[in-house]
């Protein structure tokens, strides 16, 4: 039976599972949750959701940026990065907040039992990203390993944070539906959430009792 979220139809809610793509599916149908991979453009709320999921399930939140970026924004060499992440995903439980597909391929999502795609509207993610970045820049907030936001890194060039966020948002919408409907993900629960409200409702229905081995 297909049900909406709350009292409104959840036409934008999709779950990919063993029965294929199901629009408007009940988020309570998610199976045992122990390894969660979260994907989404910058500003979509990955870190916030990962923190909440990790606390709810009693597993660590793995912030991949903190592993990948060393001091002065140096990047860990790809072979070393992949080896480190292979160790991470071999653990019994975790919530991982970035996929890094260009360097890791499908390593993280294929190791997960549940994949959450935060597909919020671009204007929402960009507004959130602008507020977050401005706050970090003004307060000189340390991100990872002594790194802080710079205006050059945020605003200028094709590799700027905003350009990157827009490109990833468009790329995900173009490629992820076909990817997650493919045979490699038939044993996964893949949840596509398109609003903050859907995120809250889904999180409320994923409790520690759904963790592997729970009563």
Predicted regions and their residues:
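Extreme N-terminal, non-catalytic leader segments
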Residues: 3, 9-33
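The conserved Walker
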Residues: 42
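A glycine- and Lys/Arg-enriched "phosphate-lid" helix/loop adjacent to the NTP-binding pocket
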Residues: 120-172
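Conserved nucleotide-sensing/catalytic segment adjacent to the nucleotide-binding pocket
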Residues: 60-115
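Hydrophobic anchor at the beta1->P-loop junction of P-loop NTPases
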Residues: 38
């Amino acid at each position: 039976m297909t049900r909406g979220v709350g009292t409104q139809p959840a036409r934008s809610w999709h779950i990919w599972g063993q029965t294929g793509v199901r629009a408007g599916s009940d988020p309570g149908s998610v199976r045992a949750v122990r390894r969660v991979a979260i994907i989404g453009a910058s500003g979509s709320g990955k870190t916030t959701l990962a923190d909440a999921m990790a606390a709810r399930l009693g597993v660590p939140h793995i912030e991949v940026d903190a592993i990948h970026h060393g001091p002065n924004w140096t990047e860990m060499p790809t072979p070393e990065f992949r080896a480190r992440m292979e160790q991470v995903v071999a653990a019994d439980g975790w919530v991982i907040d970035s996929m890094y597909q260009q360097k890791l391929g499908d390593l993280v999502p294929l190791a997960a039992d549940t994949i959450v795609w935060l597909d919020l509207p671009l204007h929402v993610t960009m507004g959130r990203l602008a507020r977050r970045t401005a706050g970090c820049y003004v307060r000189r907030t340390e991100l990872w390993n002594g790194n802080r936001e710079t205006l050059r890194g945020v605003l200028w060039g094709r590799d700027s944070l905003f350009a990157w966020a827009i490109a990833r948002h468009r790329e995900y919408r173009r490629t992820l539906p076909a990817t997650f409907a493919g045979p490699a993900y038939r044993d996964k629960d893949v949840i596509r959430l398109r609003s903050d409200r859907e995120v809250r409702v889904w999180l409320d229905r994923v409790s520690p009792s759904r963790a592997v081995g729970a009563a």
